[in-house]
Amino acid sequence: MRVAGAAKLVVAVAVFLLTFYVISQVFEIKMDASLGSLFARSALDSAIRSTKPPRYKCGISKACPEKHFAFKMASGAANVVGPKICLEDNVLMSGVKNNVGRGINVALVNGKTGDVIDTKYFDMWGGDVAPFIEFLKTIQDGTVVLMATYDDGATKLTEEARRLIAELGSTSITSLGFRDNWVFCGGKGIKTKSPFEQHIKNNKDTNKYEGWPEVVEMEGCIPQKQD
């Protein structure tokens, strides 16, 4: 009886050890597979991150150098989609912000700090040009001025208004016509003509939309005003 009992004990221990061994092997295989999947997924995520193109402020195509403000802007599309003005990854004016309108849309920015001073739009089709002229006269030296048309930005413009905008560095303002698309970035006190200006004429033979030219876009880096 003692021999039979001992034999049963030996068998039970052997079965236990065998079961433990099998379970440990299966667990180890699963663990290896899980770790392998984890490392493979991490490597894939790293590869995706390394191949993803970098995003620059306002979505411009390349980074601006130090002491420059990144900007991107677009005119309105016909009389349907309003213009958009972005500076340093901050959308200053857009249809989503509900602060744009028919005519000339203007954003004023401190040329030293990049802080927004004011945003306004002036109706140059059914409005009065006088408030626009007074607004232009109040702009202080060192202010960055960004302008974009929507629908029609020229019908009510007078020679005085055009002259004041030209003093901000614009070249195309003298020829801006009915329903032309135009974007401009200049500054009060600028000594030369601004390199940041795009203008597309309203031409029935080349217009993208019925009665309006295509949207005009522009991006760049504005030098920060130094003391």
Swiss-Prot record:
Leader sequence segment: 1-24
Any Pfam family the entry gives: ILEI
Superkingdom in the source lineage: Eukaryota
GG-type lectin domain ranges (all copies): 67-225
Gene Ontology MF terms: carbohydrate binding; cytokine activity
GO biological process: epidermal cell differentiation; ERK1 and ERK2 cascade; gene expression; inflammatory response; keratinocyte proliferation; neutrophil differentiation; phosphatidylinositol 3-kinase/protein kinase B signal transduction
Location within or outside the cell: Secreted; Cytoplasmic vesicle
Gene Ontology CC terms, in alphabetical order: cytoplasmic vesicle; extracellular space
Keywords: Cytoplasmic vesicle, Developmental protein, Disulfide bond, Lectin, Oncogene, Secreted, Signal
Function: May be involved in retinal laminar formation. Promotes epithelial to mesenchymal transition.
The protein's name in its UniProt record: Protein FAM3C
UniProt lineage: Eukaryota, Metazoa, Chordata, Craniata, Vertebrata
